[in-house]
Amino acid sequence: EFRINVIALLFAFFLVVYGISFFSILEKMRYITYFRNLSTYLTAFMLLVITWNVIDRWWQIEKLLKAIVIVMLIASIVGVLGFSFEIFRVQFKSLTGYFMPSAIAKTGYGSVIAVRNIGFYNWFMGLGTYFRVSSFFLYSTMFSSTLAITLPIALFLRNINKGVKRNFYTFSVVIMGLSLLFTTGRVAIMAIFVGYVLFRFVSLRSFALKFSIVGVFLLLCSFFLLWLEQSGIFYQIIDLVLYSRGEGSANTRGKIYVQTFNSFLERPLFGWGTERDVKGLAYPLGSHSYYLGTLYKQGIVGFTLFITIVVLIWNKLKVKVFVDNNFTRFFKYGQFLMLVYIMNSFTDVLDLDATTMFFLWVIGGYSPLLALKR
């Protein structure tokens, strides 16, 4: 018996909009970007339909989650070794690189695909020049985003296991956490900490307790922010956050966001199909934000479908439970994961890397839905 759900239907409509946006592409070089991104969404859609109809037992879900954690543990070990020892900072030509036209391979995005490495040298305040790890992923931000959405699953598996298995997942969490720090992915790291705090808050059942916590928190924050502003430390903290990777990082992002939105207004319905290179910007329009990027590339129609899918997945996880078992614990950690994903998407584009998209939709969307089938 073939089964389908409302999220799969909305995903199908999103793919239709994605197809329509193809006709808005102006740069021929961007066709490869478009089809690469489209392939990640097609893969995600097929996985959604297949897993919804095939996987219907808890052990199958757990096996899938374990496989993802093991893969990310291996990627994290590679990242930690690459950060620590120069001998592991290998570089090689990818299989795609042998078939890619030289004109495309010489571009910024094409060169990353054609020649693979486990990281690159960068600058960060307090560290100076350092090796920023990306492991098997295209960019360090993709690696940090995938680590951020996988860590809640590793914590969940640690929670439901005992003995040697529990120690293994403890080790996995530590190594993945170290690797996340070595990516210096500021937003991904912040998303983990803030997401955990919000996760613990939404887990509280007492409305009075929640209201009291919010009231005390707002009061303390008001006094603390006032003190920071009066002492001048507040502006120093802002400068530290914004310019920790240099002034160019913050200034470039600001220009990208403004010009991306202005360009979106020219084709608001179905968008531009893909990112676009413009003179004067180091990075293309539609980059550095999953939300703004989706709005730019697929317009209001695609963005509305995308946000609706995220909201539906979140609502599926907000279920009242009266027993403590693997399913109910998974719902809770699923909320943690979604909070991390929602916050991380503000400044990172997650559909550039096929591996990131695969893990994102499997553990962020499919597994909670599969668990709810039973």
Please place each PLM-identified region on the residue numbering.
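Membrane-embedded alpha-helical segments of multi-pass membrane proteins
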Residues: 1, 35-47, 143-151, 189-197, ...
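N-terminal signal-anchor transmembrane segment
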Residues: 1, 16-27, 341-343, 355-362
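A membrane-periplasm/extracellular boundary helix in multi-pass inner-membrane enzymes
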Residues: 77-89, 124, 183, 203-244, ...
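Transmembrane alpha-helices of multi-pass inner-membrane enzymes
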Residues: 197, 333-344, 349-374
